Amino acid sequence: MYLSLLLILVSFFLLKGILQSDSKLKKYVILTTFYLNYFLLTVYVLFNFLSGDGINDAIIFHVKFGINGFGVNEYIIPSIIFIFFNLIAFSSSRIFLRNLTDQKTKLITNRTLSLTILVLSIIFNPFYKDIYELLSDRSNNYQVDKNSFYEQDIIFSDTRKNIVFIYLEQIERTYLNEDLFPNLLPNLKTLEKQSISFTNIDSPRATNWTIAGMAATQCGVPLLTPIASENSMSGMDKFLPLANCMGDILNEENYKLHYIGGSDLDFAGKGNFYKTHNFDSVEGWYELQNKIKDINYRSPWGVYDDELLDIVYDRIEILSKANENFGLFALTLDTHHPKGYISASCENKIYGDGTNSILNSIHCVDELIGKFMEKFLNSEIFNNTTLVLLSDHLALKNTASEVLKNANRSNLFMIFDKDAKPQLINDIGNSFDIGPTVMSFLGANTNGLGLGRNLITNESLSLDLNINEVIDANKRKILELWSFPKIDQGFSISIDQLKIFFGNRYINFPALIVLNSSNEVDQIMFDFYYANPLSNKVNRLNKNVNFIWLDKCEKIFVNKFINNNKNKGYCILLENKKNSQFEVIAAEENSINSAYLKNFFNNE
């Protein structure tokens, strides 16, 4: 990154001679290349600040799924800096070049040198490397192991237990290292002695952000999205609908399932994930407002952890009084990167000298969890309830990153079960292994789930294999878990809801439905305030690709060069490119039946 920036700046000083050329085309090409390379490097710097790992699956996922509910306050300053430096570079360059008088750059040797340095700055720009790795289909390099993806009929015993699953936001096991963070987590350190604690749980590719960690630990799969298709999942009605997750399995056993998280359910699609996988109650910031004492008492992300944990414990007590099994999954927030937040009940408690904000918040949450667990472990509820404390993922870039980066890092994973003997398990494992391992404590015969394995009875795939290569080998199968609605039965449109209904499935619109050679749904693309417009995506489709586009009529008319100013509503464009024909239909509460679609696309 720094080398690329240095080379860009050096090339900037050496380009004067070339830009004094009489060729306008040469000037535009050189300037465009320079600006684009600089801009993409600053994009990388911004995303690297957000993720701590450059442009990765987490960044791509949020670009595709949307950022509603995002804790934007934390990132205002980095975004302003990003915009500022790009404006400075753009506006100052003409002044700089106009006043640069070194005529030596006109020499051919210096021109060659300046172009060489510009090319090197492109080669060393980490933006391109990250994008290439994300776009490349690495599954072609591996022999697909059909036994990697574990699917089985799961049977529960008659003595099944309830389950409480508490994700501690970015509190990884590394923070228990007394050499690095002395007395940071005294309560968790004590609690570990009462648990089955797994000390070597890694985060594979596409699992190291919250919703990805949830999918990994509950479904045994990484959160891959079809990036190459420019697909956006924000308009989909289902979240990984074909994945078999803990919620689906427990629902089959008549568990009453609840999710409680302090943030907006729209952020990253968490609400959609839990609703898709059969949770009976799904509550985030807006749903919890009537349960908190002061609606103004909130962090940029949502409910503070002292209030959230009180709500969670109250819900456990209510559910335990019912004569049916339950599962409660919860997510804390205070320890969110980069700085964390402090609940009011911890205002006078700091860690060390108090200068490291994320460690202060972690120290606070440790105390809150200590009090929560003391109540739980001493209650009768514990007799028939297994409780899990775990990190949702490894910590992202925060105010303790300089210490963390030199550590042997692993996720927190502790199981509290009254009928199990406390122990440390040092076997190699990963996030996928958590779900099948936990369910075995509930009375299920889970040997595995997806790419995960039950660490009590089996070995993790990570033991003998590179788990990221296993992911790449199973990439196509994982992507198929998203599933698209089918158009073989036609569809109907609700203008009020901005939805297209395909039987019991739906998608939001505006939308572009791209069909494959069999005229089945291959991709669905949606419109965002920051996305490449659907009209551009239509124009970029291959000439033999059929599609259905539902959007504002004026956008479709402009695209098809139709002179019509009367219809201001929504329209449907059906285009059969193979036969060079199209049809525009007013979308007002319209229905398109299967016979019509078959006749149009298949000439039947």
Please give the residue ranges for each predicted region:
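Transmembrane and membrane-interface helices of multi-pass
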Residues: 1-136, 599-604
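Membrane-interface soluble catalytic domains
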Residues: 18, 265-268, 420-604
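Active-site-proximal alpha/beta segments of enzymes that process anionic O-linked groups
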Residues: 51-61, 86, 90-97, 118-151, ...
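Substrate-binding rim/cap in mid-to-C-terminal beta-strand-loop elements of soluble/periplasmic
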Residues: 212-223, 403-446
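Acidic helix/loop microenvironments that form the catalytic cleft of cell-wall polysaccharide enzymes
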Residues: 215-218, 275, 331-338, 388-398, ...
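Feature representing long, continuous alpha-helical segments
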Residues: 248, 310, 314, 363, ...
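Active-site neighborhood of glycoside hydrolase catalytic domains
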Residues: 340-347, 359-382, 410-413
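Metal-dependent active-site segment of extracytoplasmic phospho-/sulfohydrolases and closely related
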Residues: 364-405, 438-442
